[in-house]
A protein has these predicted regions:
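Short, small-residue-biased leader/transition segments that mark boundaries at the very start
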Residues: 1-5
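Conserved catalytic cysteine-centered active-site region
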Residues: 8-47, 56, 72-74, 78-99, ...
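Stable alpha-helical structural segments in soluble proteins, enriched in small hydrophobic residues
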Residues: 44, 145-153, 178, 182, ...
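Alpha-helical metal-binding/catalytic segments enriched in His/Glu/Asp
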Residues: 45-48, 103-111, 205-212
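Acyl-CoA/ACP chain-elongation machinery
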Residues: 56-78, 83-87, 94, 123-137, ...
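Condensing-enzyme catalytic core mediating Claisen C-C bond formation in acyl metabolism
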Residues: 82, 86-160, 269-275
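Short beta-strand-to-turn element immediately C-terminal to the catalytic PLP-Schiff-base lysine
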Residues: 106-111, 179-180, 238, 263-268
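Flexible, low-complexity linker/loop segments at domain and module junctions
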Residues: 155, 233-276
Length: 276
């Protein structure tokens, strides 16, 4: 039994798991493993962008997954962060997060985009080192990540800001402050955690893909569970779907240890200089 436990632990090490997946698909390159708390999925996409722009690869496959365990659940319970009810991001009656499981994959290529392509325009990772589990109360790390990722992109060109929105007291309050500081308070905001919970390592990839599909469809998903504003800085949040004709969005994530990531995604025609 002891040998089986050791063998299983060895197989489940991140590097070994990544190599097995690459080997299964016949890819002989050494996988790059990105493990940075809850921003891992978005951090991996930003890493892919940098690898492509540096000319190291022509195509990068980014995949992320996470499953629940007694260790993970007990960890969140120790922070009193879990809700026994369905989570309610940014709502006045929110009581904590729900955990979920998922796996998601997205493929990036270095090429001249056609109008229907999605382009990762820019991404940034910033840290605030406020606390091992609590974010900066002024949203400093998230604010700096947003500003760095936005660059010259105008807020009014964004259809959506897909936020972390975990439904915890501190995260949602921090994000509302960061978004207002960055001038994004009038851009439609949603959190997808109410649909499938917090999928941790998969969240950044899964929520990016769903946001792409949402904007492609011209319908922004509502924030499930939201009813009444429960943060100090107002945001444009709706529990109901909304229509849009815009073709760009921002994705935000934050994680334990004070890590924050932001990225801007844009359709190829806008990226190539089309009308906004």
């Amino acid at each position: 039994r002891q040998m089986c436990i050791r063998d299983r632990a060895e197989r489940e090490r991140l590097g070994n798991s990544a190599e097995k997946i690459a080997g299964f698909f016949g890819n002989k390159n050494t996988p790059i493993v990105v493990s940075n708390a809850c921003i891992s999925g978005l951090c991996a996409q930003i890493t892919a962008m940098r690898q492509l722009r540096a000319g190291k690869f022509g195509t990068v496959i980014v995949t992320g997954s996470d499953v629940q365990s007694r260790f993970i659940i007990s960890g969140f319970q120790s922070f009193k962060a879990l809700s026994q009810e369905a989570c309610r991001p940014f709502d006045a009656q929110r009581k904590g997060l729900n955990l979920g499981e998922a796996a998601a994959t997205i493929i990036f290529q270095y090429k001249t985009p056609v109008p229907d392509d999605w382009v990762l325009v820019n991404g940034a990772i910033r840290n605030d080192a406020n606390h091992i589990s609590g974010p900066s109360r002024t949203g400093e790390g998230s604010f700096r990540a947003i500003k760095a990722a936005l660059g010259e992109v105008k807020p009014e060109s964004l259809a959506l800001v897909s936020v972390h929105g975990t439904s915890t007291a501190y995260n949602d309050e921090m994000e509302s402050i960061a978004l207002n500081r960055a001038g994004l308070q009038n851009v439609p905001v949603n959190s997808l955690k109410g649909y499938f919970g917090h999928t941790m390592g998969a969240a950044g990839i899964l929520e990016t893909i769903l946001s792409m599909a949402s904007v492609d469809d011209g319908t922004l998903l509502g924030t499930r569970g939201y009813s009444q504003c429960g943060v100090s800085c107002p945001l444009d949040i709706s529990p109901e779907p909304r229509k849009t004709t815009k073709r760009a969005f921002a994705k935000l994530l934050s994680g334990f240890g004070g890590c924050n990531a932001a990225a801007i995604f844009m359709k190829g025609d806008i990226f190539n200089g089309g009308d906004e």
